[in-house]
Regions:
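Leucine-biased recognition of intrinsically disordered, low-complexity hydrophobic segments
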Residues: 2, 11-12, 22
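Short intrinsically disordered, low-complexity coil segments enriched in acidic
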Residues: 1-4, 164
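Conserved short alpha-helical segments that host acidic/polar catalytic motifs at enzyme active sites
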Residues: 24-218
């Protein structure tokens, strides 16, 4: 059941009751997202560096800058910085992630963010989707292919599958997907077709919303 839902201009934020699964263990992934007037990648990289103390094995960012572009690497934030230094990063909306491996070994493919099948959606996720295997089998039967071993990639494919089947908005597709997944999570979703919108939700995993003057942070 949705406990609280906020729409603040171009940010949709949902909070679900913190009823944790019996075998729940906190996962120490880091999430940073930004929309506003500053260069998003600078804000996100700075935020990820402040989360390094939590421990992680890979890192990545997604930016909307002419397309929905994902940059990710195994290793430290400093390695990601070197990887993106020659990229065109001009964007005022984006999200970043530091990963602590659960499903799938530490490598570039398993790092977040993850694309949907059409690459029109991207997601970052902290937590564990306990029923991801059954969801994945359902999607495989529909012809989906996956590049990683993660539950997170299954999650974003599932969201897009719902959006296509129901012909609904991205925020409604996320809401419907969250009624089907089992586990604890904090997520942020971006959509190529909604270039000024960040969608976030949490259940059991922490996620903090910051509101500035004409800008928003997670």
């Amino acid at each position: 059941v949705l406990e609280r839902r906020y729409q603040i201009k171009n940010l949709l934020f949902a909070v679900y009751p913190d009823r944790k699964p019996l075998n729940y263990q906190p996962i120490m992934c880091g999430i940073v997202a930004y929309v506003g007037h500053r260069q998003a990648h600078e804000v996100i990289i700075k935020g990820l560096k402040r989360l390094e103390y939590r421990g992680y094995d890979s890192t990545g960012i997604a930016l909307l800058n002419g397309g929905l572009n994902v940059y990710k690497k195994k290793g430290k934030v400093s390695e990601l910085e070197r990887f993106i230094k020659d990229q065109k990063l001009d964007s005022h909306i984006g999200m970043g992630h530091t990963r602590w491996a659960t499903h799938g070994e530490p490598n570039d493919e398993n790092a977040h963010p993850h694309y949907s099948a059409t690459k029109k959606l991207a997601i970052i996720h902290n937590g564990i989707i306990e029923n991801y295997s059954s969801l994945k089998q359902e999607l495989l039967r529909k012809g989906h292919t996956f590049l990683s071993e993660t539950d997170t990639e299954v999650f974003v494919h599932f969201i897009e599958d719902i959006q296509q089947n129901e012909q609904c908005s991205i925020d409604e597709a996320v809401r419907l997907a969250l009624t089907k997944v089992v586990g604890a999570y904090a997520i942020v979703v971006m959509s190529l077709n909604d270039p000024d919108l960040l969608i976030a939700a949490r259940k059991g995993s922490p996620l903090v919303l910051g509101v500035g003057r004409g800008e928003f942070f997670m």
